[in-house]
Structure formats: C-alpha cells, structure tokens
C-alpha cells in the first residue's frame, strides 16, 4: 500500500494553510492565513473562493458539522465551526455566511470539535480552558482549566469523554462532574495533535519530541515511533480505523492502526499542519505551511486468497494474478474503488455508486448492482453470501447480486462497525452492541429477523471480538468471542428458550479465527499459538479438551500479533512490524471433520490409526459421543487410555431400552437435566430417580419419588445406607418427615428394582417387535 501524491505547481493560498475538511468524497474546503476559505472540486479540478474573512481573523482549526445518516447518497455537511486567533469561534454556512461569532477564550482558540451526534461542541484555547458549547453556540460548561495552552482536543467514541493535551501530558476527562480523570505522560516534548477513533477506540498523539504514538483508551502504549527529523505537526485516523496518516515537515506517512508504516512520501509542502481523510477513507488532504493543499490517494492495497492476489493499481483499476500459472487479469471500474474483499472464491468490490461481484472462475463477467447509499465502510463474506455496511444500514446479498435481508436493532450505529464486532456465517449474523458492549445481537441471515426467540446473547464482561463458526448445521452453530479480560469463550447461538451455557476455552487470548472449511478454531494465547481442533469438545467431554489442542511457541511473532486469516490448513499472522507470517497446520483434523460430517465412521477410525496421534483420537472420541456413535467412541477412548470411560460406554451398551441408552449418553456429557427429561418422557421414573441417587442428588431423587408416588422407600433406603457409611445422622427435614413409621425392607426394594428393569426390557422388546411387524409387507 502506498500514497499517490498530487500537488499543484502554484499554491492557491498566499499564506500557510491552517486547516482542511471534506464535505463529500470529491469536495474539500481549506482555510489559510491569507483569510480565504477556498472550495476544491476534485472532479473538475476547480477551486473557488467561498469567503474572504476580515483581516483580524486568522483561522486555526475548523470542523464540519456531522452529516445526518440514512439519506440516499452522501448528505453534505451544511455548516462548520471555524476557530480563530481572536479568541472567537465562528459558525459558518457552506456558502460562507457567518451565522454566529462567539467570544470563547482569552487568546487564540486552538481547536474546536463537534461530537459524533452534533449535539455539542468542544473548544480549547491558549488560556488553558476546555469549554463545552451547545449546537447553537451557547456555553454549557467549562470542563477544565489549566496553566498551559491546550493545543488539541478529541471526543471519545461515545461522546461522553474528551481527550485533550496538557504540555507533555494527555488527559481524558468524562463530561460527568465526579467521574475519574485519566492522565498520563505521553511525550518528552509538547503534544501538538491528538485524534481518537470511534471504531477501534484507539488514540493517536504527536509531539515536538518528533514522535507519534498509539494508545488504547486506558492510556496504555501500543506503539512508539522512532524520532523523526522534525516535530510531528498532524495526525489523523481514517474513518474505519484501519489506517492513520502522519504529517511533518516535507513528510507525509501512511500507517497501519498498530503503528507500523506502509508508505513514506516527501512532498515539497513545508510542515503539514492539518490532515483530513475523505468520508470513504480513500484519500487524504493536508494543509501545508507553504500555501499548498496536498492530496494523496491510497493505492496498491493487496488482497490474497489461496492462489489469487488482487492489487488496487489505480483508483479505478485492479490487477488479479493467479500465482499458479502467472495469469494476469485487469479489472476496470467506472468509479473510484472504496472497499474490496476476497474470500470464498469471490471478489466483492464496492465503488462510490455500484457493487461488483467477481467469481475467481471467471473475471470477465462480474455481477453488478447499484448501492443504496454508496458509502460502504465494511464488507464481510461467508460461503453463500456477503454483507455490506453501507451508510446507515446493513445489507446482505447473495453472490448473484440478489438482496437477501437487512438486519436492524434499536440504537444501531453502523459508523462504528468493523470486522471484530460483526461476524457472518451461512445462516447467522452476529453484531456486538456499542451501547452495551456485553451484548451480542443474533439474526437469521435469510430474513434479517432476530434468531430463535429473539433474545440477545449477554455476557458478564464487555466483549472485544466476535467470530461465528462457518460450517455445520444451523442448530450446531457456535460463536466464539474474546472479552475485556482476554478470556476466550464459546457458546451456541441457538438458545431454545433456555439460557445456553457460555464456556471459557482459554485465557489471555489476543486474537482468534475460525477455519473457512471446517469448525477448527485458532488463537494466540499469551506466548502460545493454539489450535482447537474440535472446540465442541467442551460440550461433550471437557476432560479430554487439552488432548484435542495443538500448541506451539508464539514468541517469534513478537508483541501484539494479529491473525489475518485461517484458510485451509494455513494460518496467516501479521506481526507488530507489519510482516506476514504463514503457519501450516496438519491437514488431518480437517479430513476427520469431513468424514464425521458424512457419517463415515469406519474411514475416520482408519484415518486415526494411520496418523497415530493422540489429538486425532481425542477429537474422534468427542465427535463420536456428540453424534451418539458409541462403538466408535469406545475405540477412540481406548486409544487415548481413558479406560473408565470405555467401561462406562460398555455399560451403556448393555442397557435394555434406547431411552436409557440416550439418557446415559447425555449423562456421559454432563447433561444431567436432559438425561432426566428423556427418562421421564419415556415413563422410566425409577431410572430417573436412580441417576439422581447415583449422583447423590438426594433432594431431587425424593422430589421425583413423591411426585410420581413410587419408590419413596427406595430413596430412603439408599439415603440411610449413605448416612451409615459416613457415620452421620439424618438432618434433612423432608427425609425425616417421610421416614416416620416407614420400615425399610431391602428384599422388597430389590424385588421392585428387578421388576422395573424387567418391565423396561419387555417394553423395549415389544416396541422393537411391533416395529419389525410394521415393516413387513
């Protein structure tokens, strides 16, 4: 990725340009010390003077009023705030009319910023004051006051906090009066510029110590640049939070959100005092010290999938290369490319007006359809369809270009959605809520309606990243997520009215990815790279989960690595320095998944015998129990030395009825309640009581015996035997009440139990014989 710079031969301003801002992706306003506000039209390359300010007004900063979302195409900003050296800020219309001028600070007003909703304005000045104003310019409060000038300010993503500079310190102050203030030393020189991104919640700072730094919202350092030759005078996040730009003297740098540099350009600009990204995130404008406005387009982005490499060579052209045969295809578009995604044998490209869908089998005939709003900020792909975040809505389309659905939920903010907070599978869409980050909304892909009974998924901690598995049946769909404590959890998306258990898979997990062809999960856990070959094991037999993992040292990936993709048996990881590392894992677990999904159990056993690895046998054991194939489970458990489980499986095989077998398989997986329900529905009340006795669940055993008026003496007898074994006296009031005047006769009880077992056997054989009679012609 690099920047394509365009700079006019002669500057349009006579003095330094202090600030720039985009109205649409093709229109920019610039303000200069020559008192002019100039409009730039990039389509026609024309510049027009909007207004000439009075000679005593020197503009310092300006910010467009946030656009209203949800109207067709880009709704243009209609007014902006301009801060100036005379201590005032001015509310100015798009046509250049000064609507209002407000005395704000003693000395220059160094920065002014609207919040994301456009309901409040923050200004900072040389007098060290931070003030909050209403939309109409009425003073609401003085948020803070200090003895040094405040050079830069930024709103937090929720518009509830303000970040500002204080010499070498950065301060985050909430708008609530008594809330805790966060302050830390950020640079060795005066901090000149800050920016806070609403999508990734990361902070940028630039200072006179010639460094730029990246921080999280708690003030923890994520990246610290090498010192440059000159002070860093400007920094700005791209709207989607994936990139940021850095400006200095004769220097413009494009960086990844983790800090490493994609490209460095040395235009003849003087110091770049202000950087603004276009709404679609494809181009940058810089306010230059020599009167120029520098424009830079982001080009040469790369996308890779299997043997295909796609490169954005120009604003309207892409090159596709097949690395197997070196075949090259050129793709040309009518409009500027905004976003693209390559996955599942399809390339999806969005321009400012249309969406193109290419198949990797045929690059010549794409499916083309018009976009609703033309401001795509995210593309996600699954095997059968893809998702677009376009303007204020989410749209799901098939690869044939057919519209499928558009999920919605109350308070949905599409401007802050990214690949970490939205996940897509063939049947489900998952979106983490921004208002309450502990909640995940789940939708049916085919209808866009809430999944199942409409309940959202709720966790006890804030969720950072979510990912749906990609294969298997809808009823088995799982979602994995990382929470604020860096715990990796997994749960089922189908709730069936009951609260599904959220199970912790690992701790200190930084990044995760599901495989695209089978439900294998990988993640970076502290200093280890881990692959969960069969994450469903946690629902089947948690004891053998450690045996189903692959682990290796991850220290070679340095600090803060990120998993980019997990395609086939290859995992791609991006290190903190920007380099890509590819890891290959064994292909056998994927083959095992394939055999099991096709119920080829003999082939699965044969594969495990061929590979001779404990992880494979452990995966097969869990898969067999999950699919109720106890013969295969017995072989697999024997292979990993779990003899007690082999014996239990043998005892299940000898049970008389299929209901009893089913109940004991559920018990084997720890599903006690479900096992009891199966037995009670089949009328096997004694067996339901007996499993509670075996588990020492005395309260429930007595409750069932009393409810069904049977085997009360059996429960009391086993309870008495249990207490005698441990030399204890009965203290439970219910047991004391039912034991009054009841003589325990073990002979009678054993006869009753024998009768129950005989009855169950007869019932089972009669149902089987009736079935066989029914089958005869």
Curated annotation (Swiss-Prot):
Bias type Low complexity, positions: 764-777
UniProt-annotated stretches for the region Disordered: 758-777
Source organism phylogeny: Eukaryota, Metazoa, Chordata, Craniata, Vertebrata
Known disease link: Short-rib thoracic dysplasia 2 with or without polydactyly: A form of short-rib thoracic dysplasia, a group of autosomal recessive ciliopathies that are characterized by a constricted thoracic cage, short ribs, shortened tubular bones, and a 'trident' appearance of the acetabular roof. Polydactyly is variably present. Non-skeletal involvement can include cleft lip/palate as well as anomalies of major organs such as the brain, eye, heart, kidneys, liver, pancreas, intestines, and genitalia.
Entry-linked Gene3D superfamilies: 1.25.40.470, YVTN repeat-like/Quinoprotein amine dehydrogenase
Domain of life: Eukaryota
WD repeats: 12-50, 104-143, 145-185, 186-225, 227-265, 267-306, 504-542
Gene that specifies this protein: IFT80
UniProt GO cellular component terms: 9+0 non-motile cilium; centrosome; ciliary basal body; ciliary tip; cilium; cytoplasm; intraciliary transport particle B
Keyword annotations of the record: Cell projection, Ciliopathy, Cilium, Cytoplasm, Cytoskeleton, Disease variant, Repeat, WD repeat
Pfam family, one: Beta-prop_IFT80_2nd
Main location: cytoplasm
Keyword Plastid found: no
Record's protein name: Intraflagellar transport protein 80 homolog
Subunit organization: Component of the IFT complex B, at least composed of IFT20, IFT22, IFT25, IFT27, IFT46, IFT52, TRAF3IP1/IFT54, IFT57, IFT74, IFT80, IFT81, and IFT88. Interacts with IFT88. Interacts with IFT57 and IFT70B.
PROSITE patterns listed in its UniProt record: WD_REPEATS_2, WD_REPEATS_REGION
């Amino acid at each position: 990725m690099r920047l394509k710079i365009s700079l006019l031969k002669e500057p349009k301003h006579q003095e330094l340009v202090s600030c720039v801002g985009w109205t649409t992706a093709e229109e920019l306003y610039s303000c200069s010390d020559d008192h002019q506000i100039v409009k730039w039209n990039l389509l026609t390359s024309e510049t027009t003077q909007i207004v000439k300010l009075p000679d005593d007004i020197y503009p310092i900063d300006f910010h467009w009023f946030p656009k209203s979302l949800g109207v067709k195409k880009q709704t243009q900003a209609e007014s902006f705030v301009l801060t100036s050296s005379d201590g005032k800020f001015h509310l100015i219309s798009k046509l250049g009319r000064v609507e209002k001028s407000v005395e704000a600070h003693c000395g220059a007003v160094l920065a002014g910023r609207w919040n994301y909703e456009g309901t409040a304005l923050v200004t900072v000045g040389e007098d060290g004051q931070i003030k909050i104003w209403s939309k109409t310019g009425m003073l609401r409060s003085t948020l803070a006051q200090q003895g040094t000038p405040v050079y830069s300010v930024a709103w937090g993503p929720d518009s509830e906090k303000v970040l500002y500079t204080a010499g070498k310190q950065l301060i985050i102050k909430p708008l609530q009066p008594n809330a805790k203030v966060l302050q830390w030393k950020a640079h060795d020189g005066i901090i000149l510029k800050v920016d806070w991104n609403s999508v990734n919640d990361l902070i940028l700072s630039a200072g006179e110590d010639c460094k730029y730094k990246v921080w999280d919202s708690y003030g923890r350092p994520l990246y610290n640049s090498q010192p440059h030759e000159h002070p860093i005078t400007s920094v700005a996040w791209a709207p989607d939070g994936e990139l940021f730009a850095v400006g200095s003297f004769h220097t413009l740098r494009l960086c990844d959100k983790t800090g490493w540099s994609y490209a460095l350009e040395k235009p003849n600009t003087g110091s770049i005092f202000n950087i603004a990204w276009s709404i679609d995130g494809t181009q940058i404008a810089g306010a230059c010290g020599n009167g120029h406005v520098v424009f830079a387009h982001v080009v040469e982005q790369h996308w890779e999938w299997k043997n295909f490499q796609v490169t954005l060579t120009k604003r309207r052209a892409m090159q596709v290369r097949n690395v197997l045969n070196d075949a090259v295809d050129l793709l040309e578009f009518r409009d500027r490319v905004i976003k693209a995604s390559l996955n599942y044998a399809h390339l999806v490209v969005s321009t400012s007006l249309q969406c193109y869908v290419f198949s990797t089998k045929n690059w010549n005939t794409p499916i083309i359809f018009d976009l609703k709003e033309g401001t795509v900020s995210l593309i996600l792909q699954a095997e059968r369809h893809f998702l677009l975040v376009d303007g204020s809505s989410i749209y799901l389309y098939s690869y044939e270009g057919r519209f499928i659905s558009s999920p919605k939920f109350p308070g949905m903010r599409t401007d802050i959605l990214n690949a970490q907070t939205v996940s897509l599978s063939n049947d489900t869409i998952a979106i983490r809520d921004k208002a309450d980050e502990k909640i995940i909304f789940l939708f049916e892909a085919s209808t866009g309606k809430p999944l199942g009974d409409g309940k959202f998924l709720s966790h006890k901690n804030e969720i950072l990243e979510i990912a749906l598995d990609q294969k298997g049946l809808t009823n088995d769909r799982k979602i994995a997520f990382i929470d604020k404590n860096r715990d990796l959890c997994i749960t089922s998306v189908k709730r069936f009215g009951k609260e599904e258990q959220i199970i912790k898979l690992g701790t200190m997990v930084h990044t995760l990815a599901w495989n695209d062809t089978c439900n294998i999960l990988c993640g970076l856990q502290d200093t280890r790279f881990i692959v969960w070959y069969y994450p469903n094991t946690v629902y089947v037999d948690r004891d053998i989960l450690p045996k189903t993992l692959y682990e290796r040292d991850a220290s070679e990936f340095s600090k803060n690595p990120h998993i980019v993709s997990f395609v086939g048996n290859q995992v791609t990881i991006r290190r903190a320095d920007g380099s890509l590392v590819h890891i290959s894992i064994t292909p056998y677990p994927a083959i095992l998944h394939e055999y099991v999904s096709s119920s080829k159990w003999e082939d699965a056993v044969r594969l495990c015998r061929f590979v001779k690895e404990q992880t494979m046998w452990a995966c097969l054991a869990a898969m067999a129990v999950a699919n109720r194939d106890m013969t295969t489970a017995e072989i697999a458990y024997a292979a990993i030395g779990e003899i007690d489980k082999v014996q239990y499986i043998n005892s299940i095989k000898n049970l008389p009825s299929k209901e009893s077998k089913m109940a004991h398989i559920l018990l084997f997986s720890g599903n006690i309640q479900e096992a009891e329900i199966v037995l009670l529905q089949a009328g096997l009340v004694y067996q339901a009581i007996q499993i509670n006795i075996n588990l020492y669940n005395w309260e429930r055993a007595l409750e069932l015996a009393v409810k069904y008026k049977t085997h009360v003496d059996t429960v009391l007898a086993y309870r008495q035997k249990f207490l005698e074994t441990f030399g204890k006296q009965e203290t439970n009031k219910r047991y004391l009440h039912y034991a009054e005047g009841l003589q325990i006769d073990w002979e009678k009880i054993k006869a009753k139990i024998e009768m129950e077992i005989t009855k169950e056997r007869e019932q089972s054989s009669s149902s089987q014989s009736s079935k066989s009679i029914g089958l005869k012609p």
